[in-house]
């Protein structure tokens, strides 16, 4: 009897975690993520990313040579800080991440997404650190970058770090693929093929991000930073970054 009850409780908890995770990465969340390409639009206009193969290469490069040292790493560190209720450390990570985002549009896009995400979920998650962080944003002590807020909310929900990282990377990859399919353009099936091929790289990215090497924080693909800055001067644009 007791073992059956425990199994049912574990199952219900697992389903609750899944529901929370799906809500956190819901593409219909009103935060404006679909408005940002983070430099991809420049790559497409310059005919560097112009096919299914080049888009697939671009996504994998971003995942394994950029995100794991930047947004993914800061998400991982923020998750740790949230576990220990270390508000000061969360502020430090916000400042550090701000310094690594050299392209203005990408920098502003990230904290706008983070502020909107926090505004949604703080209504459901009554946590003192979340409230303190929102207050720090309103007082302009921190910016509220998306990966930091994402980690804080996920940890508050009781999600694991591995699940949080996978969801974050998956969400980012889907955004890039969706934008690439629209910009190049490609067929919807091409986009699905690219996404299917990311299953193993996504797992690899999670493994590499669980315990980030602090010496590699901020390491990035310079080409992407340059295109993200060039995006400000494009003659025609579909995206805000």
Regions found by a protein language model. Give the residues of each.
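Inter-helical turn/loop segments and adjacent helix faces that build the functional surface
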Residues: 46-53, 124, 128-132, 156-164, ...
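A contiguous pocket-lining binding segment that forms or flanks enzyme active sites
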Residues: 139-184
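Charged, compositionally biased N-terminal leader segments and the immediate start
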Residues: 1-19
């Amino acid at each position: 009897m007791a073992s059956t009850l425990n199994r049912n409780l574990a199952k219900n908890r697992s389903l609750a975690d899944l529901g929370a995770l799906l809500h956190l990465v819901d593409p219909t969340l009103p935060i404006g993520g679909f408005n940002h390409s983070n430099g991809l639009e420049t790559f497409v206009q310059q005919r560097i990313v112009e096919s299914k193969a080049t888009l697939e290469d671009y996504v994998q490069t971003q995942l394994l040579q950029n995100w794991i040292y930047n947004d993914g790493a800061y998400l991982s560190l923020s998750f740790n800080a949230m576990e220990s209720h270390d508000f000061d450390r969360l502020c430090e990570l916000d400042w550090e991440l701000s310094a690594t985002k050299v392209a203005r549009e990408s920098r502003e896009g990230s904290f706008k997404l983070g502020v909107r995400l926090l505004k949604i979920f703080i209504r459901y998650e009554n946590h003192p650190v979340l409230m303190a962080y929102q207050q720090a944003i309103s007082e302009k002590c921190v910016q509220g970058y998306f990966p930091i807020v994402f980690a804080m909310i996920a940890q508050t929900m009781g999600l694991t770090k591995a699940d949080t990282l996978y969801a974050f990377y998956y969400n980012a990859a889907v955004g890039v693929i969706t934008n690439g399919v629209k910009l190049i353009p490609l067929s919807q099936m091409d986009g699905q093929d690219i996404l299917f091929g990311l299953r193993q790289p996504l797992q690899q990215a999670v493994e590499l991000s669980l315990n980030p090497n602090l010496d590699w924080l901020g390491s990035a693909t310079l080409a992407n930073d340059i295109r993200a800055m060039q995006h400000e001067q494009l003659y025609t644009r579909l995206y805000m970054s």
